[in-house]
């Protein structure tokens, strides 16, 4: 504990911060890493959709909303899943991974029903 | 039983027919006179009316005459040439009801005017000057006489040519003035010139009325298109006035009176609308709805025929002018002016607003001197049905792609997530 405090106080450069981030991130379980990857994917898609809308205009506004809601919704649901199965949060005693994942799938089903209704 | 029903049908049909024909240009006229000698001094005026087919019924002012019976009026026009008599058999309320029934009134004043006539004039937006006053003008008077109250008047109404039909000969006028209320329904048909003023006939003490606000002859066209005309001079309608001369040239009195009276008795300037056609030409909605159901943003054609009544021919002729069309739902969403063609047809193509609701298509003509025309038609404009929107727009393809990529992404993520053997250390 004391060593980390001393290093951070000594050289708080950008590279050292990034390095320590990746060091500690490598300790996260693989399942969470997969989730993080998917989160990045949904986030980038959302940004692309929004930029496209800014460039082309809001003409099929409902389609834009459907696409944007789809990305945002996926992102939020996946974040929720990540919170529930993360061991640090100690949800494991009340909510099992299987239960959390089933909830996640069910919510996704509802989300995509809404999205595809709205898309037309 | 059979006979009875046929008889009843016949009676109803004839009643309906008579009510239809009594509508415009009615000729039954009641003439109320102070004294029957007016019939002789004004004989040309009355003869002209009779020649045009008016059925005149002369009554002395104190004779009991019933204007209205069971909501039906016995006359279409009323000529009140009894300015002085206090014993008029009907009150100003009766006359007001007569006007409210859509009938026309012509009345004239003289040196002394009874309360009854004053009340009627006040109801019609004209405030007659005090008794024993006259309009004087020291510049525009008949030079052949020394009397400065015999005016050579030429300040005719000029913004409604239908009334006097372009009369420009000056007329001789001697009579009492009146103030005209500032009201779009009132027409100052003849006023004094800017040097005219109203003054006591004997003492010459002037009253407050002067200049162009001295009304000599004015009219009211009520909201129900009944027309009321008041002249400050009863002598204007007399034979003497008809054949009077100004500087050895014929005065315009006869023509003025003829045109004034024929307008007042609705021989012209009456409008009606018919043959409304409101058709959908094209639609932006993709579904196949019935052709008479309007949806938002439809392209429609609006066509209306407007005719005006020609009292001389006794028939309706096309009215060529301008018509205002409004498409209203609380606020006017569209307001346009349509020019009429030679057949009196007013046609326009336009796009319905992008708002749904019950809309009023209101065509109106408010032209001074003409009867007001308001043609109202209501029709709902529906929103697009769920299946009438455009689908598969090219601009939306990236959005479709996004949604599918999210779906497939979730699917692939689920497989990887489920088959991942890594245990979360608790």
From Swiss-Prot, chain A:
The protein's role, per its UniProt record: Subunit of the oligosaccharyl transferase (OST) complex that catalyzes the initial transfer of a defined glycan (Glc(3)Man(9)GlcNAc(2) in eukaryotes) from the lipid carrier dolichol-pyrophosphate to an asparagine residue within an Asn-X-Ser/Thr consensus motif in nascent polypeptide chains, the first step in protein N-glycosylation. N-glycosylation occurs cotranslationally and the complex associates with the Sec61 complex at the channel-forming translocon complex that mediates protein translocation across the endoplasmic reticulum (ER). All subunits are required for a maximal enzyme activity.
Taxonomic superkingdom: Eukaryota
Protein name per Swiss-Prot or TrEMBL: Dolichyl-diphosphooligosaccharide--protein glycosyltransferase subunit 2
Disulfide bond among keywords: no
Lumenal-side positions: 58-60
Originating organism: Dictyostelium discoideum (Social amoeba)
Alphabetical keyword list: Endoplasmic reticulum, Membrane, Transmembrane, Transmembrane helix
GO CC term, one of those recorded: oligosaccharyltransferase complex
4Fe-4S in keyword set: no
Entry's transmembrane regions: 37-57, 61-81, 100-120
Cytoplasmic side: 1-36, 82-99
Biological process, per Gene Ontology: protein N-linked glycosylation
Membrane topology: Multi-pass membrane protein
Family, as annotated: Belongs to the DAD/OST2 family.
UniProt subunit comment: Component of the oligosaccharyltransferase (OST) complex.
Associated pathway: Protein modification; protein glycosylation
InterPro entries referenced in this protein's UniProt entry, alphabetically: DAD/Ost2
Subcellular location: Endoplasmic reticulum membrane
Swiss-Prot record, chain B:
Keyword presence, Nucleus: no
Spans through the membrane: 399-419
Lumenal compartment spans: 23-398
UniProt signal peptide: 1-22
Locations listed in the record: Endoplasmic reticulum membrane
Gene Ontology CC annotations of this record: oligosaccharyltransferase complex
Sequence ranges on the Cytoplasmic membrane side: 420-426
Primary localization: endoplasmic reticulum
InterPro entries for this protein: DDOST_48_kDa_subunit, OST48_MD, OST48_N
Keywords of this entry: Endoplasmic reticulum, Glycoprotein, Membrane, Signal, Transmembrane, Transmembrane helix
Glycosylation sites: 286
Pathway entry: Protein modification; protein glycosylation
Superkingdom field: Eukaryota
Topology class, membrane: Single-pass type I membrane protein
Alphabetical list of Pfam families matching this protein: OST48_MD, OST48_N
Any one biological process term the GO annotation gives: protein N-linked glycosylation via asparagine
UniProt family annotation: Belongs to the DDOST 48 kDa subunit family.
Cited function: Subunit of the oligosaccharyl transferase (OST) complex that catalyzes the initial transfer of a defined glycan (Glc(3)Man(9)GlcNAc(2) in eukaryotes) from the lipid carrier dolichol-pyrophosphate to an asparagine residue within an Asn-X-Ser/Thr consensus motif in nascent polypeptide chains, the first step in protein N-glycosylation. N-glycosylation occurs cotranslationally and the complex associates with the Sec61 complex at the channel-forming translocon complex that mediates protein translocation across the endoplasmic reticulum (ER). All subunits are required for a maximal enzyme activity.
Description of how the protein assembles with itself and partners: Component of the oligosaccharyltransferase (OST) complex.
Name of the protein this chain belongs to: Dolichyl-diphosphooligosaccharide--protein glycosyltransferase 48 kDa subunit
The species this protein was found in: Dictyostelium discoideum (Social amoeba)
Source organism phylogeny: Eukaryota, Amoebozoa, Evosea, Eumycetozoa, Dictyostelia
């Amino acid at each position: 504990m004391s060593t980390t405090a001393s290093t951070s106080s000594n050289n708080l450069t950008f590279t050292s911060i990034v390095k320590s981030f990746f060091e500690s991130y490598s300790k996260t379980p693989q399942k969470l890493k997969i989730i993080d990857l998917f989160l990045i994917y949904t986030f980038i898609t959302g940004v692309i959709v929004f930029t496209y809308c800014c460039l082309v205009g809001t003409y099929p506004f409902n389609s834009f909303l459907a696409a944007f809601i789809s990305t945002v919704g996926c992102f939020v649901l996946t974040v929720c899943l990540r919170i529930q199965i993360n061991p640090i949060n100690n949800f494991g005693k009340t909510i099992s991974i299987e239960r959390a994942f089933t909830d996640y799938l069910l919510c996704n089903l509802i989300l995509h029903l809404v999205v595809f209704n709205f898309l037309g | 039983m059979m006979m009875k029903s046929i008889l009843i049908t016949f009676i109803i049909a004839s009643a309906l027919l008579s009510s239809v024909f009594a509508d415009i240009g009615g000729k039954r006229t009641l003439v109320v006179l102070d004294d029957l000698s007016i019939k002789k001094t004004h004989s040309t005026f009355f003869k002209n009316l009779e020649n045009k087919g008016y059925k005149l019924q002369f009554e002395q002012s104190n004779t009991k005459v019933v204007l209205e019976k069971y909501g039906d009026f016995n006359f279409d026009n009323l000529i009140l040439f009894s300015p002085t008599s206090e014993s008029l058999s009907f009150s100003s309320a009766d006359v007001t009801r007569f006007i409210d029934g859509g009938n026309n009134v012509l009345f004239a004043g003289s040196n002394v005017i009874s309360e009854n006539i004053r009340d009627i004039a006040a109801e019609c937006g004209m405030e007659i000057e005090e008794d024993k006053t006259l309009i004087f003008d020291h510049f525009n008077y008949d030079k052949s006489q020394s009397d400065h109250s015999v005016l050579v008047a030429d300040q005719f109404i000029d913004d409604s040519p239908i009334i006097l039909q372009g009369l420009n000969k000056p007329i001789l006028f001697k009579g009492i003035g009146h103030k005209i209320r500032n009201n779009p329904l009132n027409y100052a048909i003849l006023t004094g010139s800017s040097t005219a003023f109203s003054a006591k006939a004997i003492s010459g003490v002037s009253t407050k009325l002067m200049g162009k606000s001295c009304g000599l002859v004015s009219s009211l066209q009520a909201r129900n298109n009944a027309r009321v005309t008041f002249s400050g001079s009863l002598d204007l309608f007399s034979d003497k006035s008809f054949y009077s001369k100004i500087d050895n040239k014929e005065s315009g009195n006869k023509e003025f009176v003829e045109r004034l009276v024929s307008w007042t008795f609705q021989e012209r300037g009456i409008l009606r609308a018919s043959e409304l056609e409101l058709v959908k030409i094209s639609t932006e909605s993709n579904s196949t709805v019935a052709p008479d159901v309007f949806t938002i943003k439809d392209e429609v054609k609006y066509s209306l025929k407007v005719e005006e009544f020609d009292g001389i021919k006794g028939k309706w002729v096309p009215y060529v002018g301008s018509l205002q069309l409004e498409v209203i739902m609380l606020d006017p969403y569209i307001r346009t002016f349509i020019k009429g063609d030679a057949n009196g047809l007013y046609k326009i193509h336009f796009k319905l607003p992008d708002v749904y609701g019950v809309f009023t298509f209101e065509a109106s003509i408010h032209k001074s001197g003409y009867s007001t025309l308001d043609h109202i038609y209501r029709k709902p404009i529906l929103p697009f049905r769920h299946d009438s929107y455009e689908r598969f727009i090219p601009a939306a393809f990236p959005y479709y792609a996004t949604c599918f990529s999210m779906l497939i992404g979730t699917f692939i993520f689920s497989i990887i997530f489920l088959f991942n053997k890594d245990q979360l250390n608790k």
